[in-house]
Amino acid sequence: MAYRKRGARRETNLKQDDRMQEKEENKSTNSVIENKNGTKTQLSEKVLSQKEEVITDNQEETRIADEVKKSNKEESKQLLEVLKTKEEHQKEVQYEILQKTIPTFEPKESILKKLEDIKPEQAKKQTKLFRIFEPKQLPIYRANGEKELRNRWYWKLKRDTLPDGDYDVREYFLNLYDQVLTEMPDYLLLKDMAVENKNSRDAGKVVDSETAAICDAIFQDEETEGVVRRFIAEMRQRVQADQNVVNYPSILHPIDHAFNEYFLQHQLVEPLNNDIIFNYIPERIRNDVNYILNMDRNLPSTARYIRPNLLQDRLNLHDNFESLWDTITTSNYILARSVVPDLKELVSTEAQIQKMSQDLQLEALTIQSETQFLTGINSQAANDCFKTLIAAMLSQRTMSLDFVTTNYMSLISGMWLLTVIPNDMFIRESLVACQLAIINTIIYPAFGMQRMHYRNGDPQTPFQIAEQQIQNFQVANWLHFVNNNQFRQVIIDGVLNQVLNDNIRNGHVVNQLMEALMQLSRQQFPTMPVDYKRSIQRGILLLSNRLGQLVDLTRLLAYNYETLMACITMNMQHVQTLTTEKLQLTSVTSLCMLIGNATVIPSPQTLFHYYNVNVNFHSNYNERINDAVAIITAANRLNLYQKKMKSIVEDFLKRLQIFDVSRVPDDQMYRLRDRLRLLPVEIRRLDIFNLILMNMEQIERASDKIAQGVIIAYRDMQLERDEMYGYVNIARNLDGFQQINLEELMRTGDYAQITNMLLNNQPVALVGALPFITDSSVISLIAKLDATVFAQIVKLRKVDTLKPILYKINSDSNDFYLVANYDWVPTSTTKVYKQVPQQFDFRASMHMLTSNLTFTVYSDLLAFVSADTVEPINAVAFDNMRIMNEL
């Protein structure tokens, strides 16, 4: 029986105590009694509990109740763990959502490799002329559909591919234009691509391997006239050595000839001499006395180079493109870290920690706050901090600070950091947290002031508020400097540079910091215990003992930053980045405490490498902008504007190499499109598009997949004989047919005219470029004639889905052989209007192309410069004093 027990709690407690005493006296009690005692011990723990306990005399029930409670506890623990895991997972999900809005998340090595792999375009050697057309031999068919033994040469497209979609033919021309832009050479040297003419009498050469192959095929064709063979045998180059000019014979379609002639007339190569190379080196490095630059040879008169395209800020990616800007700054940061020199001859970590321990008199102390001063100090952290600071400034990448408020040494080191690095380099929340910690831990307690209660969202930073409240001149003066520590924007050699304050560059600001720290250490800390005051004073003492080294460190930091900054070619726009580089204040302490006397400056080879990578990326960036602007203009003029725009912008970003395009948010894609639309088209690219536009009909004729129109009728129309195909549903002219323009029809959407004519049994010719599907099976063709063509026109009234069908009936068909005595005449309710491609005429296709006989294009201009440095220990800063004075 179970009953409620309210009044006898004290009695139970006494009995419990007696039994516990008995247990202590007699340790040989049997296990049953021990079990009972164990159960009652649990009860004694709950004596003072306010909850009512249900006591039962049934041992089994007690055990079950205990197990239930135990399982409940375990369940609640598991629930807590699940909730905790869920919370952590939620944070990870939120972080992942943020990550997805930033286009690059790849290992650092791969980003660096992508940047270094961007080479100038002229490194691609042209081995062939640009061609859209090639001559092909096609059989001739007799009136009865049998193939003759004779062949005829026609100009056909080399790459006859049509993409899927409603605007197939227009997309074909857009893709063709993109292909031309990709293959458009910056220069052509015909001598490099010339090959031997096998049929030449005197080992002459023709312009490229394709010309040689065409000549060979024509020479071997039995129907070729003797005069043409003799002409091929005479084909060879003509050299005018005194003018450095050579003429090569070529076989080209007139349109291809126009393209290649344009490329030859508009080459981007310029003469190269020593002056150009020397002026190519950034002026600040040329004038830096620490670097000795020398050229030990003259360049020949045939030397050429392609001027890099270094236009600035055409898209302003720093403005309202947070994800794209984050990716660019990340890749710049990774590149910059790879070129910042490693610190040398740092103070031994062990020796420094031992010295700091002596200064702190740690053996005699009982408090532990000062032992924290020594945590995390190591040379790796010092070197990492040095690289992070310089690389973040070079890439204008925002940093966030990580620190522990109770580690006063970290906060004092943070005061040096905030003195030498402009405020803009830190994410605002992190900067506020660090400044607030310094004020409430060091500055306000020193003067006995109340803690600062900072309101989140206050436009002023804690240091700005403190500057108005602190009466001490030195401390207020230092706060004023930190509050106004901003980059100066200076345009040097046409590039916007973010320059440090002169007081930081020469290290004088460290003396200002030390004066403020000395004032703080002399204060009484009236509201704090003596131990607290002593800890702060000893932390300040540790830093002030390193005054000379800190001045040197500041000068070294500024010198390396400015020297590497001279190699940056894109404007250094400063915008806070979405992601940040974490900086531990303990690593700043490591840097302050372990910096030695050894000067480190970038090697000339490192500078040249950094400069080359920056130039190549910047030039590629501008060229890809030119391509994208040209394609957008072409899409607009081909009425593909709405459909193709996003893919054009995606292609543009892919070609910049560093972006993971699938992660770029759509809003930034369309904003990028709007910026690209405003830019003018580069003249070469515009001329090339106009060439394509003027010759669209010739290109359509040469295609086997593009028709110039379609004829539709209710009544059957007989197949006509065509000498190129045999019997086909092809019309070579539109005489006698009522014509309607397809483009106009799609624009107006008025199909009444077509349906009326068809219902009156009048064939209609819809004229305009559209693709057709070739099908040589007669049975499958007849089965789908009416359904595919007429139904779509009359019922769906959608001309843009029209697919005209070309089919052939000739002696080569798989399932049908047409002979003269067949009574059945094949018919069709649709005909394809297709103009005859241009016949290949050898005389009209032979062109002489002219180029320089020889010149050499150099892509790496700095390879000619031999460079060395003075002994780093003698290296001087901008003020003509040694960078490191504390020797």
UniProtKB/Swiss-Prot annotation:
PTM notes: Sumoylated with SUMO1 and SUMO2. Sumoylation of viral proteins seems to have a positive role on viral replication.
Region of interest (5-fold hub), ranges: 1-87
UniProt keywords, alphabetically: Capsid protein, Inner capsid protein, Repeat, RNA-binding, T=2 icosahedral capsid protein, Ubl conjugation, Virion
Basic and acidic residues bias spans: 9-27
A Pfam family it matches: Rota_VP2
Family classification: Belongs to the rotavirus VP2 family.
Primary role: Inner capsid protein that self-assembles to form an icosahedral capsid with a T=2 symmetry, which consists of 120 copies of VP2, with channels at each of its five-fold vertices. This capsid constitutes the innermost concentric layer of the viral mature particle. It encapsidates the polymerase VP1, the capping enzyme VP3 and the genomic dsRNA, thereby defining the core.
Subunit text: Homodecamer; each decamer is made up of two conformers of VP2, called VP2A and VP2B. Interacts with a VP1-VP3 complex. Interacts with the intermediate capsid protein VP6. Interacts with NSP5. Interacts (via N-terminus) with NSP2.
Protein name as annotated: Inner capsid protein VP2
Organism: Rotavirus A (strain RVA/Human/Japan/AU-1/1982/G3P3[9])
